[in-house]
């Protein structure tokens, strides 16, 4: 590429590493958007499981403990992994710099680091699904969450990281 050739969408690097190491606010916003969509569908799947359980009386589909886990994980995913970080992260990275006429955000490396921290916290919180779930409700109120034998500490640590 010569010195006079500007970088545009035709000669921009391609591949997964170009996405993971990008400093472009639009790409980072798209990564926030896609991860938000993923967590939205995961939280929606948990909501469907709860709705199917409540469709008829009795324990038809899942037990009481699994229902409590689904309720907690649905609320935590939708609040802490979708609404709070993904919507402002996606809209704030894609639309806001374009609306104010900025060529880029002020600190692009910090912007990418915030997405990595969000991803790490989300993976840490999702670890609790594999490791047995949490049954305290998405608010994690102290009287019940301190007496619960479920994975409250890893889940709250993942949310704190986010």
Role assignments for model-derived ranges:
Residues 1-162:
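...captures the hydrophobic TM-helix bundle architecture rather than a specific catalytic motif
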